[in-house]
Amino acid sequence: ERLVTDYDVEVLSTCVQNYVKGENEIPAGDEWINGVLVRRFMAEPIHPELHRFYVRKSKWIRKFRKILYQLNILRFIADVYPIWRQMNEIEQRVMQSYMFYSPRLIAHIQKCKNEYKAIIPINISYPLAYYTSLCAPDKTILVPTMHYESSTFRAIYTEVFTSVAYIGFNTVSEQRLAENIFGRRMSPHGLISVGINVVADADWVDVKRKYNLPEEYLLYVGRIDKGKLNHIVQYFLHYKARYANSKLKFVLVGGLFSAPVSHSDLIYTGFVSENEKYAIIRHAKIMVNPSKFESLSLILLEGMQLGKPMLVNGKCEVLKEHCSKSEKAALAYWNKNDFISKLASLETSSELCREMGKKGKVYVETYYSWSVIMERLKKAIESV
């Protein structure tokens, strides 16, 4: 939306609303939203069993490339052999059996690519970013949102990362990861990232009553599934068992994609509106991001913007980078006991929370204000 004053902007998406089911629940067609033309296309049905079969069948090439990365030699091999075609057909089937695969959307880009000045696919983990990047690589500004995980080492990505016009990363850690995978033959690249919006809070009295929220709480915002939570619920319950006098509850905001743990100290809100989310963040005592896989972490930056002290998973390079660059506006924990220790320090020290909150606000304003981000993005668009 921030580009509409300078460009005609279209957003191409699918009709999928729930990524787990992968069903076309939103009508196909065009819609104007805040000056942006949103075009929605039907996605193919997902085939979970078939997808898992192809993932297993192509595992060896990902594992081989990951081992070369761990030995710190993949980048040097990539300088000589930038494009890998091993297991290409099987990895194509991995993509085509996955969620959000839409031949109709891809065909639209192929047909209309000459009408676009720039194409900006986001998230290389999903089929659309991969296929749209190859439709018009000379016009493509790829925003890969990469993580250190198995899928990052797919051989088919080598063609994309060496042929697109520009690659915009969210953090230095993400950029370094890509450089060590794709080497010096990788396309021109740099940081773009994303800015943080200021959203008005919903009325706190109404929100608190609606979701039965306590006075003091640790807050998680995101998908409620095992892959994102990484034992954090169990860690918190161990904390409460050790510190019986603690008044903290654990509020989890987001859709339920795995069975919730039932406990009197745990409160699940389900999906909330943006205004409600900001009200819940503003009144949290402490926030936590337990994910091991992040390319940026918007929720961490939103919390910092509102002066919230953060606890993050130390096993995620991107989150560790935020801790360092913000001068410890966020604290990394490494295991259950470390989490318990640092949460206790934050719960019992208002001064520490205030100091971290001040640092977080400065960090977001310095690195993630929209003026900084839009200058980078427009420069990338004009370069293609």
What are the roles of these predicted feature ranges?
Residues 1-42, 114, 236-244:
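N-terminal subdomain of nucleotide-sugar transferases
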Residues 292:
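Aromatic "clamp/platform" in nucleotide-sugar-dependent glycosyltransferases that forms part
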Residues 345, 352-366, 376-379:
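A short, well-ordered alpha-helix in the C-terminal region of glycosyltransferases
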Residues 210-228, 233-237:
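Conserved donor-binding/catalytic core segment of Leloir-type glycosyltransferases
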